[in-house]
Amino acid sequence: MAASRIAVDAMGGDNAPEAVVEGAIQALHQTEGELSVLLVGPEEQLHGLLASRPEAPEERLRIVDAPEAIGMGETPSTAVKQKPNSSIHQGLAAHHDDHADAFVSAGNTGAIMAASMFILQRIPGVERPSIAGFFPTLKGSSVVLDIGSNVDCKPAHLLQFARMGTVYARQVLKTDPPSVGLLNIGEEPGKGNEQVKAAHELLRDADDVHFVGNVEGGDLLFYAADIIICDGFVGNALLKFGESMSTVLSDMCQQEMERQGLAPDEQKLVAGVLDEVREGFDPEALGGAPLLGVNGNVLVGHGRSTADVIAQMIHSARTIATENVAHALEEAFQSSSA
């Protein structure tokens, strides 16, 4: 894999900056010299954290001073305009100016989206950039677009999500051609509201999308398609359901083991199996959600991301940069508009 420079928002997330710095160090130790990290945040504070970590590979770590931070509760558009020296703004600027090949943040999702649109700009032809998520199934994770960045969508937007998801799956997941399903209340083409019925027609007629038809909610866990298309309102609810599902099932099993009076060693054995299942159903293990449709490589993480998740996000960002997803999207939208 080619050498990559990843800009990381050191102030993004509930556990920042400590977990972010720890995650960056982990990622660097997990690779050879072909990876370097730009930690973006208050210079003095970050120097202090690194000084207490003598094992940090300083030759592959650089600090980009960003004295301001955008909080999780701040209004995205206002924060981006009023805080040009924030870690999100400066990290994206480093990517835009080619000092970094990708940008990673577990910070305010709306601010990341707004700043990316402002600094990196949309790819020509893309009306709505989309954040893609991953829904756990029995056969791996399906890519879901959109997961909350676009709650009100036109049918044409859903078609664009399908095109972006197709490029991502082909470039990063090496699935060719990836299957695309439209989340609906029934499998028949005439099912759904007006938005979904119109989107079905557009997807059916698109020659650059491998559309397999409508997908019902009950089929999602059985891997109905490589890519699932829906608006961000539905997608966000779906993703959060997936995040909580394994925890609830695990707790229910624990309660049942106690009710049946299983011995401690028996409970430990079952708990080990459940932990493996939970890990397989953990969308964070895949390393962040890609923001598709802007002129750059941006990964968005959950606010509660741990050091392990930050490290995985850095590796995922490196893959997206190496596979040049943004350029592939640009080519795809040029072809679709021709």
Swiss-Prot record:
One of the protein's GO biological processes: fatty acid biosynthetic process
SUPFAM superfamilies hit by this protein: Isocitrate/Isopropylmalate dehydrogenase-like (SSF53659)
Matching InterPro entries: FA_synthesis, Phospholipid_synth_PlsX-like
Pathway in which this enzyme or protein is active: Lipid metabolism; phospholipid metabolism
Reactions this protein catalyses: a fatty acyl-[ACP] + phosphate = an acyl phosphate + holo-[ACP]
Gene3D superfamilies xref list: Isopropylmalate Dehydrogenase
HAMAP family attached to this UniProt entry: PlsX (MF_00019)
Subunit text: Homodimer. Probably interacts with PlsY.
Protein name: Phosphate acyltransferase
Species this chain originates from: Salinibacter ruber (strain DSM 13855 / M31)
